[in-house]
Amino acid sequence: MDSLSDIDGDFDGRNEGGSSSDYRLLGRQITVHQFMGGGKAADLLLWRRRHLSLGVIIISTVAWLIFEFSGLPFLSVSSDVLLIVIMISFVHARVSAFRNRQLHSLPELVLSEEMVNSAAASFRIKLNHLLVMAHDVTVGNDFRLFFKVVICLWLLSAIGSYISLCTLLYIGTILSVTIPALYSKYQSKVDKCCGTIHRRLSHHYKIVDENVISRLSWSLSKDKDS
């Protein structure tokens, strides 16, 4: 969340008259790989591990086709898949033992205490941030935030009326695997285009803010005082 706040601050720090060629979507001194954490997940999303990235797309596509067109419930399909995998592994182990063949050692899946504490701390910070936002929206302290939340929820409602949750998750997975890699490849062109769009949107938002939002906020605060 801190990185997103830094980006928002970077947006606000640019004046409207700035050139779109100077615009940087992720900041001036950060790469896409660094912005995404620089770990194995970033390597996967940026196609530095092509076989894993391609595997994610294939598995996501197969899963989407199964759940979307078969009509089978998620719990039933997941249980059947796990059952088949466990049975195959068990039979393979028994056959190998019967033939006195050595099994390939499987890696142990163990979460370290440091990893769990780090994930819990990160989740706590993000959850507290969301709770603060929810409090500000419900009590009416920040009208601009309320306006943004209403627009986002309305868009989600409109999208959800046409697209199922399974399809929405599939689209999100495909976009998360393709967009970062494409942006990393065409970063300069995308930054230039986004700079132009951002400058125009900032101009229109300034007009709406001065003529509508600021007046509504002033009238609401006046009603509270009275």
From Swiss-Prot:
<keyword id="KW-0812">Transmembrane</keyword>
<dbReference type="Pfam" id="PF02453">
    <property type="entry name" value="Reticulon"/>
</dbReference>
<dbReference type="GO" id="GO:0005789">
    <property type="term" value="C:endoplasmic reticulum membrane"/>
</dbReference>
<feature type="transmembrane region" description="Helical">
    <location>
        <begin position="54"/>
        <end position="74"/>
    </location>
</feature>
<feature type="transmembrane region" description="Helical">
    <location>
        <begin position="75"/>
        <end position="95"/>
    </location>
</feature>
<feature type="transmembrane region" description="Helical">
    <location>
        <begin position="149"/>
        <end position="169"/>
    </location>
</feature>
<feature type="domain" description="Reticulon">
    <location>
        <begin position="41"/>
        <end position="224"/>
    </location>
</feature>
<keyword id="KW-0256">Endoplasmic reticulum</keyword>
<dbReference type="InterPro" id="IPR003388">
    <property type="entry name" value="Reticulon"/>
</dbReference>
<protein>
    <recommendedName>
        <fullName>Reticulon-like protein B16</fullName>
    </recommendedName>
</protein>
<dbReference type="GO" id="GO:0009617">
    <property type="term" value="P:response to bacterium"/>
</dbReference>
<keyword id="KW-0472">Membrane</keyword>
<dbReference type="InterPro" id="IPR045064">
    <property type="entry name" value="Reticulon-like"/>
</dbReference>
<keyword id="KW-1133">Transmembrane helix</keyword>
